[in-house]
């Protein structure tokens, strides 16, 4: 192989964080010759902030990444040291699988998967510039002068894009603590005409767990039976640990109030907007100062690591103030601070500059994923990375992009929110963002998305086999329970209280009743005892939601019709009579591709949508007439 060939790829992914790893893996699985460009191999898969994966809404994203044969779920299963299913007492649609993770195990597991992936080469070095041929991406220039040629680029810069760390009055350029920022790429993106903004996130101090008074604290245990993220994980084998729980005190709050002027957040040093749902401890005291305390979870960062992450006291106060704060918190009075908490500002691009494939509208072949799009969180980044990497590979191969709809995945909800509405603060996934969350459950992610992964060629043979085995078992169990039925009178004999209407009900129908599960039905039909535990749970959840799903299907059908109604690329929004100038301007700026996207533009009313549809039909008629005229001239 010549040196020129060695530096030529189909897809180049810049950044080795959660978005970058998923993007590189997805592109390589799709058959693209892929390069992952990162400063150092040993930083691939680093958990920059909280050592945890999943949670409410976020756990759904991890399951969807896994259903598409991504990495995060399998890596988290290997590294998880405290698995807990959040919202366990609520319905399955809003339950959130979560685990604390051993930072080292997570990083090493991710690096192993990246190393073992076919078609994927890790290139150590900093990305200095993007190379374009006209309005199409054609390569990446590295800081050492090497030029990598490609057909598509996925940019996953995280907090590195003009990153600036703040600790009280101190501030210095960094991508995260101890690592250099990416300084040249923002200027290149501005030269392309992109709109850049500044966002902020923060992290708490790190503590020496050996100096914490664990005996005085309440402890929280892992679930007795850990539930894995991945279909490919049979059971969790990593030892499980406890974490401690403490609270801030009125004395803590007094110290924070007295030093707000020294906080980078409140001194005016920080321009960027921080995440609403992950506030700094300063924010908590300013906005919720009437509370007598705020909860802190003391999360060990590894099985053989004494570092503890105090979840709940993210801060940009000076180091000396952070030390004073620790002395006022029960159990932390003698805690040794290993690293101060800090805030970090970074550049991001208005995600309305993107298509739903995550390709930029201005530069063909340039895809963005993760915090550069205004999101926060490993899970949001990983999900975007997978979609961007897949579509980058398809762009390089000349194939149509994969678009996930709001009706089929939380990934689709997130991408649609970002590209149609933009962000005014870091975007975090919640189940409440999805209109059809009864359909988009964590437990059925494989059923929703694995067939798609198979169709587009990113599914391994091992996963296909396991998925089909599980689906066959569920299909058989469904068929059996639907074939067995009972009258209300006979059901009463087994202490099942049904409406005495004379209508026979199947075992499947009975599972939709809140107080009836498979254990109770085995007393009537002993053959149901042969259904394995995994299939049993899936069947019970499916039956429980069956009635609601039938009702929701009509709403889904309406949205899918709107998604299919495309807006022609040549449509002149200025020519739509009756549409306000403000809406015309917004439509020209956003360039919605479907009626469903247009409906989510701020200010779009039903009347405005009707005008738009009428213009599309008129445009379609003119296009047809023009084609017929050309055809007639050709015949003459």
UniProtKB/Swiss-Prot annotation:
Its cofactor is FAD. FAD binds at residues 15-20. It holds the Pfam family GIDA_C_1st. PROSITE patterns: GIDA_1, GIDA_2. GO terms for molecular function: flavin adenine dinucleotide binding. Belongs to the MnmG family. This is tRNA uridine 5-carboxymethylaminomethyl modification enzyme MnmG. It comes from Brucella canis (strain ATCC 23365 / NCTC 10854 / RM-666).
């Amino acid at each position: 192989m010549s040196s020129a060939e060695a530096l030529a790829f189909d897809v180049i992914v810049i950044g080795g964080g959660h978005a970058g790893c998923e993007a590189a893996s997805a592109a390589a699985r799709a058959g693209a010759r892929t390069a992952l460009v990162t400063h150092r191999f040993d930083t691939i898969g680093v958990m920059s902030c909280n050592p945890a994966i999943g949670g409410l809404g976020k756990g759904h994203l991890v399951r969807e990444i896994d259903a598409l044969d991504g990495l995060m779920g399998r890596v988290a299963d290997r590294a998880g040291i405290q698995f807990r299913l959040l919202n366990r007492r609520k319905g399955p649609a809003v339950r959130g699988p979560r685990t604390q993770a051993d930072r080292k195990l997570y990083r090493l597991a991710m690096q192993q998967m990246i190393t073992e992936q076919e078609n994927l080469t890790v290139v150590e070095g900093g990305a200095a510039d993007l190379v374009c041929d006209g309005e199409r991406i054609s390569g990446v220039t590295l800081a050492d002068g090497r030029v990598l040629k490609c057909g598509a680029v996925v940019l996953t810069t995280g907090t590195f894009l003009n990153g600036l760390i703040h600790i009280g009055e101190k501030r210095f350029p960094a991508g995260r603590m101890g690592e250099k920022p990416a300084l040249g790429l923002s200027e290149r993106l501005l030269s392309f005409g992109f709109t850049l903004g500044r966002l902020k996130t923060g992290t708490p101090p790190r503590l020496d767990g050996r100096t914490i008074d664990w005996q005085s604290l309440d402890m929280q245990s892992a679930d007795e039976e850990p539930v894995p993220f991945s279909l490919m994980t049979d059971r969790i084998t990593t030892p499980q640990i406890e974490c401690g729980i403490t609270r801030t005190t009125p004395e803590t709050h007094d110290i924070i109030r007295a030093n707000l002027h020294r906080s980078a957040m409140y001194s005016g040093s920080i321009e960027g907007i921080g995440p609403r749902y992950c506030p700094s401890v300063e924010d908590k005291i300013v906005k919720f100062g009437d509370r007598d305390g705020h909860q802190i979870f003391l999360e060990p960062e590894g099985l053989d690591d004494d570092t503890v992450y105090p979840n709940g006291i993210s801060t940009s106060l000076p180091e000396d103030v952070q030390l004073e704060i620790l002395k006022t918190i029960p159990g932390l009075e003698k805690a040794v601070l290993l690293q101060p908490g800090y805030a970090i500002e970074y550049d991001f691009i208005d995600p309305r500059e993107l298509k739903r494939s995550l390709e930029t509208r201005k530069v063909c072949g340039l895809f963005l994923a993760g915090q550069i799009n205004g999101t926060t969180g490993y899970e949001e980044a990983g999900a975007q990375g997978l979609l961007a990497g897949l579509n980058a590979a398809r762009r390089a191969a000349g194939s149509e992009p994969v678009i996930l709809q709001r009706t089929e995945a939380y990934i689709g909800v997130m991408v649609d929110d970002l590209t149609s509405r933009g962000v005014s603060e870091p975007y975090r996934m919640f189940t409440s963002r999805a209109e059809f969350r009864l359909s988009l459950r964590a437990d059925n992610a494989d059923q929703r998305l694995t067939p798609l992964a198979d169709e587009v060629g990113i599914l391994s043979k091992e996963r296909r086999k396991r998925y089909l085995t599980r689906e066959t078992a569920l299909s058989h169990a469904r068929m059996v329970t639907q074939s067995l039925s009972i009258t209300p009178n006979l059901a009463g004999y087994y202490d099942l209280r049904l409406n005495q209407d004379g209508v026979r009900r199947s075992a499947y129908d009975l599972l939709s009743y809140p107080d009836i599960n498979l254990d109770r039905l085995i007393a009537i039909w002993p053959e149901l005892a042969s259904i394995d535990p995994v299939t049993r749970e899936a069947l019970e959840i499916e039956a429980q939601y069956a009635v609601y799903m039938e009702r929701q299907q009509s709403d889904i059908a309406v949205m899918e019709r709107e998604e299919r109604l495309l807006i022609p690329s040549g449509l002149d929004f200025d020519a739509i009579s009756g549409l306000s100038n403000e809406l015309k301007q917004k439509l020209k700026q956003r360039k919605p591709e479907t009626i469903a996207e247009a409906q989510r533009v701020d200010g779009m009313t039903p009347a405005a949508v009707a005008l738009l549809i009428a213009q599309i039909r008129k445009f379609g008629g003119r296009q047809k007439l023009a084609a017929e005229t050309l055809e007639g001239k050709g015949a003459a």
